[in-house]
From Swiss-Prot:
Name of the protein in question: ATP synthase subunit b
Native species: Priestia megaterium (strain ATCC 12872 / QMB1551)
One Gene Ontology cellular component annotation held by this UniProt entry: proton-transporting ATP synthase complex
NCBIfam families (alphabetical): ATP_synt_b, PRK13453.1
Membrane topology of the entry: Single-pass membrane protein
Similarity comment text for this entry: Belongs to the ATPase B chain family.
Chain's role: F(1)F(0) ATP synthase produces ATP from ADP in the presence of a proton or sodium gradient. F-type ATPases consist of two structural domains, F(1) containing the extramembraneous catalytic core and F(0) containing the membrane proton channel, linked together by a central stalk and a peripheral stalk. During catalysis, ATP synthesis in the catalytic domain of F(1) is coupled via a rotary mechanism of the central stalk subunits to proton translocation.
Listed GO MF terms: proton-transporting ATP synthase activity, rotational mechanism; proton-transporting ATPase activity, rotational mechanism
Assembly information from the UniProt record: F-type ATPases have 2 components, F(1) - the catalytic core - and F(0) - the membrane proton channel. F(1) has five subunits: alpha(3), beta(3), gamma(1), delta(1), epsilon(1). F(0) has three main subunits: a(1), b(2) and c(10-14). The alpha and beta chains form an alternating ring which encloses part of the gamma chain. F(1) is attached to F(0) by a central stalk formed by the gamma and epsilon chains, while a peripheral stalk is formed by the delta and b chains.
Cellular compartments annotated: Cell membrane
Signal peptide start-end: none
Main location: membrane
Keyword Membrane set for record: yes
Keywords in alphabetical order: ATP synthesis, Cell membrane, CF(0), Hydrogen ion transport, Ion transport, Membrane, Transmembrane, Transmembrane helix, Transport
Length: 172
């Protein structure tokens, strides 16, 4: 059968030696391509694959770092909000304390002024009473001297008392 195939191939105008030569040349070409073309191309592809894998790893690493930074920023923001809340609470408490201090100082000043006013009123009252006593004493002396100057009847005594009351009323 192999011989009949050769005749069929020969009748068709195909030469078996040419096919064998082309097959050997193709294998040599394939070996040369493997050594000089496919090897370097595969090396370049391998390097490219490693480079891309490295880039992916680097991107994932940077993504993780970015997530960490975002989380850190959130934590810092949370702490800042807490600090602001504490500061606001302290400021409110400080303002409340200051208000109470000012109110207490105002009350003390009011009490002091009230006490000073009472003391001044008391002094003026004492001075008025003392002045009135002096006037009463001098009027008493005056009346006594008038009584001594003349002896009075009951009518004269009543008249003298009414005059004295009028003088005391006028002095006031």
């Amino acid at each position: 059968m192999a011989v009949s195939n050769m005749f069929v191939l020969g009748a068709a105008g195909i030469n078996g030696g040419d096919i064998l030569f082309q097959l050997v040349m193709f294998l040599i070409l394939l070996a040369l391509l493997q050594k000089f073309a496919f090897g370097p191309v595969m090396g370049i592809m391998k390097k490219r694959e490693e480079h891309i894998a490295g880039e992916i790893d680097e991107a994932e690493k940077q993504n993780e770092e970015a997530k960490k930074l975002v989380e850190e920023q959130r934590e810092i923001l949370k702490q800042s909000r807490q600090e602001v809340q504490v500061m606001m609470e302290n400021a409110r408490k400080s303002a409340e304390d200051k208000k109470e201090e000012i109110v207490a100082a105002a009350r003390e000043e009011s009490e002091r002024l009230k006490a000073a006013a009472k003391q001044e009123i008391e002094q003026q009252k004492d001075q008025a009473v003392a002045a009135l006593r002096e006037q009463v004493a001098s009027l008493s002396v005056l009346i006594a001297s008038k009584v001594i100057e003349k002896e009075l009847s009951e009518q004269d005594q009543e008249k003298l008392i009414h005059e004295y009351i009028q003088e005391v009323g006028d002095v006031r």
